[in-house]
């Protein structure tokens, strides 16, 4: 079973600025209400193989690992727990003078359906909060 949530929105900020916010994962708690903490487990630029410990309200700490990264455009990371793997995708596409952000959260495994039933509403709310945090922060940067 696979469950996926996806959200996209236009942002009145250059794609480069939006990208810099997306990959600065340790800054997310200052921008996004649905993140309590993000701690990188390695140093240097975000890259395939980078890992972070993420804490979100009402969820257990999770260890995320970057599985794909296309500089300036997208990155994906995954976390796994018994019976379920969760993948988060972050895509920035230029749109005129601004950008479009697309966020996805995909869960698969034997417990994916149960997670969708129990946590689907919270997942969608957190995804919306994440999008709003990125949009608000990107649009508030003087430029």
How should each PLM-predicted stretch be described?
Residues 4-6, 60-64, 84-89:
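Short, surface-exposed coil-to-beta transition loops
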Residues 78-129, 134-136:
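Beta-strand/loop substructures that line and gate deep hydrophobic ligand-binding cavities in soluble
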Residues 12-16, 43, 67-72, 91-100:
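A short, structured loop/turn motif at beta-sheet edges
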Residues 50-57, 75-81:
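Short beta-strand segments that buttress and anchor functional surface loops
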Residues 1-43, 133, 139-143:
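Hydrophobic ligand-binding cavity/cleft-lining segments
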Residues 59-61, 71-72:
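A generic structural motif
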Residues 8-12, 39, 53-55, 65, ...:
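Generic structural detector for well-ordered beta-strands
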């Amino acid at each position: 079973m696979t469950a996926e949530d996806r959200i996209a929105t236009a942002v009145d900020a250059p794609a480069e600025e939006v990208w810099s916010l997306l990959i600065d994962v340790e800054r997310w708690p200052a921008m996004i209400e649905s993140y309590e903490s993000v701690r990188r487990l390695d140093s240097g630029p975000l890259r395939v193989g980078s890992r972070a410990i993420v804490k979100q309200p009402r969820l257990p700490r999770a260890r995320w690992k970057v599985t794909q990264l296309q500089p300036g455009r997208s990155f994906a990371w995954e976390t796994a727990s018994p019976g379920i793997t969760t993948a988060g995708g972050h895509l920035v596409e230029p749109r005129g003078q601004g950008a479009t952000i697309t966020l996805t959260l995909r869960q698969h495994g034997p417990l994916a359906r149960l997670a969708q039933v129990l946590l689907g509403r919270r997942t969608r709310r957190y995804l919306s909060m994440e999008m709003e945090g990125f949009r608000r922060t990107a649009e508030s940067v003087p430029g």
